[in-house]
């Protein structure tokens, strides 16, 4: 601890400037806090985190909480440690904020184990690449952009195309069937969604309200209404809890909703810290900040972290620096398309834009690979023919092209699926489709075994057998 040797008390400084969430604090010149040290405001629960050393004993900090009421001259003490948050099984079933303080009105988190939210990423020789597939039960994902156990997945989409609903369905299908533990970090999203998620988890038994220790998920929220410091650091708090479980040898699912808000909070803080903005107004340190977070989300020889991250795409522009920087770190990218959503096909995943490193015959097998590529080839051909159809109509197409279009439209509809978490809105029960059934269904459509069925029979069904049943009623 950075202690004053005479009085054996923590080193104190005083506030000399406040600009929004950024606070400058003056300390004795020979006892300046280190970068990332947490400072406590005397007589208040407010924590400040050191970002820059300006010289002459002055450090520039960001406030992890509201800076209302701060003024020059207030005393601040240096804890001489980074932000420390509770980790381990005591966090299960609890909702915490960026500092690890519980916000679920169920008393304090009773644990002796605390960890710093800043730590180095595992070294190269500690890493453990995984080839094992993670079945999600969602046809379009399992077919064209399969997830790897211990991999990183991004759900990309603009406003209102279904990122959070897809995330909730993945949690429903994976976290409930998953024997390991989950950590959910709500980064700058709506408080209502955090509340819905908590109740959904409680109803399904993933959060055990009678005995919290038997819960399987820990939740960390820093929502939209909170200051930028909270939104910037809350992803690290959630990650620290996930890393702690991983280092105990567990397989962890780490959900982040939404990584874009993490970048945006960094942009707000960066401007207040006086850094010159770079492209589109983002912080100049965007790639480094993103890299520091993403490099820690990884699997080691001890345990695995499988991460699923929602990524908001501003103005549906995937070349925007924030989503573009995120792309580089992911194993699978699930791109949600407004065009597909406007056709009423949900999940609105674009099978031609979504990718996965796992879609390799050596990993998924020849059968799966060939079926996925045949589906993408059929859809790509349909996309090329759409201009001709729009100008000349279907009648001008060659017979084989007419057949391709008919199959592509069936594939498009068969890629839709009723979700468990959307039962309230759709009125139809959710479907979980196994990978084997998914491959069988698409193989039959591509091979022409379903050419006699009307295309509406394929809309919002689970397996191919359900499409045959539905066709009988049409």
UniProtKB/Swiss-Prot annotation:
It is a peripheral membrane protein. Keywords: ATP synthesis, ATP-binding, Cell inner membrane, Cell membrane, CF(1), Hydrogen ion transport, Ion transport, Membrane, Nucleotide-binding, Translocase, Transport. The keyword Cell inner membrane applies. It comes from the Bacteria. Its main location: membrane. It catalyses: ATP + H2O + 4 H(+)(in) = ADP + phosphate + 5 H(+)(out). One of its GO terms (cellular component) is proton-transporting ATP synthase complex. ATP binds at residues 157-164. Pfam families: ATP-synt_ab, ATP-synt_ab_N, ATP-synt_VA_C. Its EC number is 7.1.2.2. It is an enzyme of class 7 (translocase). GO terms for molecular function: ATP binding; ATP hydrolysis activity; proton-transporting ATP synthase activity, rotational mechanism. SUPFAM superfamilies: C-terminal domain of alpha and beta subunits of F1 ATP synthase, N-terminal domain of alpha and beta subunits of F1 ATP synthase, P-loop containing nucleoside triphosphate hydrolases. It is found in: Cell inner membrane. Gene3D superfamilies: 2.40.10.170, Bovine Mitochondrial F1-atpase, Atp Synthase Beta Chain, Chain D, domain 3, P-loop containing nucleotide triphosphate hydrolases. HAMAP family: ATP_synth_beta_bact. Belongs to the ATPase alpha/beta chains family. F-type ATPases have 2 components, CF(1) - the catalytic core - and CF(0) - the membrane proton channel. CF(1) has five subunits: alpha(3), beta(3), gamma(1), delta(1), epsilon(1). CF(0) has three main subunits: a(1), b(2) and c(9-12). The alpha and beta chains form an alternating ring which encloses part of the gamma chain. CF(1) is attached to CF(0) by a central stalk formed by the gamma and epsilon chains, while a peripheral stalk is formed by the delta and b chains. Produces ATP from ADP in the presence of a proton gradient across the membrane. The catalytic sites are hosted primarily by the beta subunits. This is ATP synthase subunit beta 1. It comes from Albidiferax ferrireducens (strain ATCC BAA-621 / DSM 15236 / T118). The gene is atpD1.
């Amino acid at each position: 601890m950075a202690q004053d040797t005479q009085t054996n008390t923590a080193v104190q400084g005083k506030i000399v400037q406040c600009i929004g969430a950024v606070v400058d604090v003056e300390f004795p010149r020979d006892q300046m806090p280190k970068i990332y040290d947490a400072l406590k405001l005397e007589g208040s629960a407010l924590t400040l985190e050191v970002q820059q050393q300006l010289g002459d004993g002055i450090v520039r900090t960001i406030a992890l909480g509201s800076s209302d009421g701060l003024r020059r001259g207030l005393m601040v003490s240096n804890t001489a440690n980074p932000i420390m948050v509770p980790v381990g099984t005591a966090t299960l079933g609890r909702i915490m904020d960026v500092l690890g303080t519980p916000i679920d009105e169920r008393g304090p988190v009773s644990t002796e184990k605390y960890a710093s939210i800043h730590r180095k990423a595992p070294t190269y020789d500690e890493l453990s690449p995984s080839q094992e597939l993670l079945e999600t039960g969602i046809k379009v994902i399992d077919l064209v952009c399969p997830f790897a156990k211990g991999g990183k997945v991004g759900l990309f989409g603009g406003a209102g195309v279904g990122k959070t609903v897809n995330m909730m369905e993945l949690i429903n299908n994976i976290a409930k069937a998953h024997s390991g533990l989950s950590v959910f970090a709500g980064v700058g999203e709506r408080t209502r969604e955090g509340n819905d998620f908590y109740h959904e988890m409680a109803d399904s038994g993933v959060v055990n309200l009678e005995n919290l220790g038997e819960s399987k998920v820990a939740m960390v929220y820093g929502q939209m209404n909170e200051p930028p410091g909270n939104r910037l650091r809350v992803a690290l708090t959630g990650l620290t809890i996930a890393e702690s479980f991983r280092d105990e040898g567990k397989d962890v699912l780490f959900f982040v909703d939404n990584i874009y808000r993490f970048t945006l909070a960094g942009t707000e803080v960066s401007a207040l810290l006086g850094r010159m903005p770079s492209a589109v107004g983002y912080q100049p340190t965007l790639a480094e900040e993103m890299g520091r977070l993403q490099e820690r989300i990884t699997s080691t020889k001890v345990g695995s972290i499988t991460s699923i991250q929602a990524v908001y795409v501003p103005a549906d522009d995937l070349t925007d620096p924030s989503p573009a920087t995120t792309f580089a770190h992911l194993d699978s990218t699930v791109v949600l398309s407004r065009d597909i959503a406007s056709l009423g096909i949900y999940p609105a995943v674009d099978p031609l834009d979504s990718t996965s490193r796992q879609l390799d015959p050596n990993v998924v097998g020849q059968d799966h690979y060939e079926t996925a590529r045949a589906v993408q080839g059929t859809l790509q051909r349909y996309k090329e023919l759409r201009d001709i159809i729009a100008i000349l109509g279907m009648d001008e197409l060659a017979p084989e092209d007419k057949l391709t279009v008919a199959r592509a439209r069936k594939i498009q509809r068969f890629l839709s699926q009723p979700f468990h978490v959307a039962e309230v809105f759709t009125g139809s029960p959710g479907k979980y489709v196994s990978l084997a059934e998914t491959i069988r269904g698409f193989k039959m459509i591509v091979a022409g075994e379903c050419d006699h069925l009307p295309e509406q029979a394929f809309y919002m069904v689970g397996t191919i057998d359900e499409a045959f049943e539905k066709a009988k009623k049409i």
